[in-house]
């Protein structure tokens, strides 16, 4: 357990990420553009602010130094920081500067437009002096410094080098989320956290195999005089090079959104190092944190409890973790709806699994993003099929079905029909067998769409049981 609450300083470009959510169903009569009916809007900390958010949710003590304007966006930014109890006393105001705000217009879960209002000029000399003065007074209280560079003018080459020099004199590690192609301004820092594309641009090395990866890591380490070089490799994990190459594989099970995952990585590494983990252990911890975050929508964060729970779940049976109770599936379905995922629902007894079942479920899964299967409990099967059924009990049937790639979640229901379960899930697509053609299907008044899937001819549990019984007669 990581129990320390290290004091970490974040210096960089603060901004507001502003979201407008709505729907679009017509074209403007004034110009060939979509008309979006905005239904809600929200604002969150962006840029270096997302790093701060990540550190805060991990339980870290966080200080921030940045330069902002004297405007409404700055006031909004301060308010968001104060909500998470982050001091704004070290935010330096330049009157002619625009505080960065990025607005994204999202319609039907698709981003259709982004517009930015900001200044990207270098900060002035007075701001530079104030930052250095503040740092020199307080440097000894920090376990590490994160430089979050978004190229908006705060982290000038001179300021960056001055920060690194002061930190090194006081044995404080500097971790950098870099920007641009020239990384020379970060020389002397502890490590950088570029992604693969950024590393390729900075080193002019095409990373296509292990040798080219090592060459890129070596190039970064030598040119920037790093203690350790890192490259984040998306779904492949994180590559580390001190004297030898180590790749920490990703541990994400479900990826919904990678937005802000880089901020989670650098924050988690700094937090772990502040808890006396070595760099390999810190990167493993960061991989777990990123695994949680990419399962959420937008620039998300994670808590220590979520990380520990996630790590624990990775060691559990994969099939068991996909078998849910009514309460669990209700919460999960709500989350999936919020993430904009298309939910497919089907149900049945699935007593003796055969190829017809498998093909049916594969087709059902193709109609959306997530397939939830309602499984008749043993008592329900007996009512439908007779006292001799089921052949396999409900736990065995659920486990086997949950192990199929096409099935995301299984829920056992005791009732004669899955109507109450469907009400909880509110699926977008309801799938039933082709033999329901022209018949009423339970739950079709709840789902947006009904799909009827043809069965494979001659394949059924009843036929399978008959063949087994006939073979037994022949053998007796």
Curated annotation (Swiss-Prot):
Q: Which residues form the active site?
A: 263
List the Gene Ontology MF annotations in alphabetical order. Answer: ATP binding; heptose 7-phosphate kinase activity; heptose-1-phosphate adenylyltransferase activity; phosphotransferase activity, alcohol group as acceptor
Asked if the keyword Nucleotidyltransferase belongs to this entry, the reply reads: yes
Segment Cytidylyltransferase: which positions? 345-476
EC number(s) per UniProt? 2.7.1.167, 2.7.7.70
Q: Name one GO biological process term.
A: ADP-L-glycero-beta-D-manno-heptose biosynthetic process
Name the chemical reaction catalysed here: D-glycero-beta-D-manno-heptose 7-phosphate + ATP = D-glycero-beta-D-manno-heptose 1,7-bisphosphate + ADP + H(+); D-glycero-beta-D-manno-heptose 1-phosphate + ATP + H(+) = ADP-D-glycero-beta-D-manno-heptose + diphosphate
Please give the InterPro entries that the UniProt record associates with this protein. Answer: Bifunc_HldE, Cyt_trans-like, PfkB_dom, RfaE_dom_I, RfaE_dom_II, Ribokinase-like, Rossmann-like_a/b/a_fold
- KW Transferase (keyword) present: yes
Tell me the pathway: Nucleotide-sugar biosynthesis; ADP-L-glycero-beta-D-manno-heptose biosynthesis; ADP-L-glycero-beta-D-manno-heptose from D-glycero-beta-D-manno-heptose 7-phosphate: step 1/4; Nucleotide-sugar biosynthesis; ADP-L-glycero-beta-D-manno-heptose biosynthesis; ADP-L-glycero-beta-D-manno-heptose from D-glycero-beta-D-manno-heptose 7-phosphate: step 3/4
- Positions with a binding annotation for ATP: 195-198
Protein keywords: ATP-binding, Carbohydrate metabolism, Kinase, Multifunctional enzyme, Nucleotide-binding, Nucleotidyltransferase, Transferase
GO cellular component terms, alphabetically, are: cytosol
- In terms of superkingdom, the source organism counts as Bacteria
Region (Ribokinase) location: 1-318
Q: What's its job?
A: Catalyzes the ADP transfer from ATP to D-glycero-beta-D-manno-heptose 1-phosphate, yielding ADP-D-glycero-beta-D-manno-heptose.
Q: Which family does it belong to?
A: In the N-terminal section; belongs to the carbohydrate kinase PfkB family.
**Assembly notes:** Homodimer.
Q: What is this protein called?
A: Bifunctional protein HldE
Q: What broad taxonomic lineage does this protein's source fall under?
A: Bacteria, Pseudomonadati, Campylobacterota, Epsilonproteobacteria, Campylobacterales
**Annotated gene:** hldE
